């Protein structure tokens, strides 16, 4: 499993990254305004070189389907922490109290919640000091061509599971890296340090550090990691307290998987011919760049604002799509509620591409996302203020939020209405002509 320190191949890759400054010599930080598109020939590689050519799947699209996944992992659930009736508190509060070192019979203790298989992160009460260990792991395959941005996206995706719990600090990260055996030695030496640097830069932006990991050789490139934090109960928000009347807020647009696939189709005439009537090459390039920037943006700001605006529950939107993750979150609720989604903020033109291609299921909410936004249950009176606050320049550029649905009385399910309102989200650098007439109202109430 994970090495204790940055040694071996992982250490060599990180050491090589020390001398690398990212694409075009830039350190992007919280702004992508100075980003220049990746050109493989700048590294001495062929102009036709593609990072995505070293895997057969892309990003979070590699996930095992949710229902099958839960069956596969059923044997890992410990008898003393099995989820009762699909609730979010694992094993009951008394068992959680005993795990935390309290005497048997001490009674329910909301101070020591626990969370296991089925949600974004595990929450394990520690034996000492009323603290909890919150930990998550994630990895996937390349879905963009820029190695540096791929590293940033992978790190942002790992940290996002902590941010979905309202956690803003991470104590430590490990990096998991697989170098493709199909790569030449020259390709490995030039590309791998950029991926490592992107991962490390995103970790540093998140206020943490990569202290070790594991690196192997594999047919496909893989990158991801482990994020760990020890915190007090008031530092995280359990994903189980939505109430009737809450609204659902989404902090990144959908359509990332569609955008990265459409970008690859520019070099595939058979696929491109199916969608070229609904989107131009320029629009695909802009959508791809916007998807890349969004995936590389940390959800840390949204996590902090969850506390400010009294969030009741949240999850991040990744491989199961907005519908799958909404359904999973709904199952965790203590109250008898259901989620109804009315609005779908989507990167401009990607809804049309999804429909024309006959793939993805973007409008049905089943299209995979990678390093997507947080879906947050907020009190109705707080939601519009959240959407306004997150766009403040003090948090840097690129943060957005939309009210996309409501929480109503129900049986812990989630659904998207038959004809959801599509909000076309204008990519940075696009002309106003791409913008749909109603897409500027970021905090509009869902319609029935």
Curated annotation (Swiss-Prot):
Domain of life where this protein originates: Eukaryota
Short name of one Pfam family: AIRS_C
Gene Ontology terms describing biological process: selenium compound metabolic process; selenocysteine biosynthetic process; selenocysteine metabolic process
GO cellular component, one term: cytosol
Modified residues (N-acetylalanine): 2
Cofactor note as given: Binds 1 Mg(2+) ion per monomer.
Residues with the Phosphoserine modification: 46, 97
EC numbers, comma separated: 2.7.9.3
Region (Disordered): 85-107
One GO MF term attached to the UniProt entry: ATP binding
Disulfide bond sites: none
Annotated Mg(2+) binding sites: 120, 161, 316
Binding of ATP, residues: 63, 118-120, 138, 161, 212-215
InterPro entries for this protein: PurM-like_C_dom (IPR010918), PurM-like_C_sf (IPR036676), PurM-like_N (IPR016188), PurM-like_N_sf (IPR036921), SPS/SelD (IPR004536)
Post-translational modification: Truncated SEPHS2 proteins produced by failed UGA/Sec decoding are ubiquitinated by the CRL2(KLHDC3) complex, which recognizes the glycine (Gly) at the C-terminus of truncated SEPHS2 proteins.
Keywords from the named record: Acetylation, ATP-binding, Kinase, Magnesium, Metal-binding, Nucleotide-binding, Phosphoprotein, Selenium, Selenocysteine, Transferase, Ubl conjugation
Active site feature: 60
Reactions this protein catalyses: hydrogenselenide + ATP + H2O = selenophosphate + AMP + phosphate + 2 H(+)
Cofactor: Mg(2+)
Role description: Synthesizes selenophosphate from selenide and ATP.
Family: Belongs to the selenophosphate synthase 1 family. Class I subfamily.
Name of the molecule in the record: Selenide, water dikinase 2
UniProt lineage: Eukaryota, Metazoa, Chordata, Craniata, Vertebrata
Gene name of this polypeptide: SEPHS2
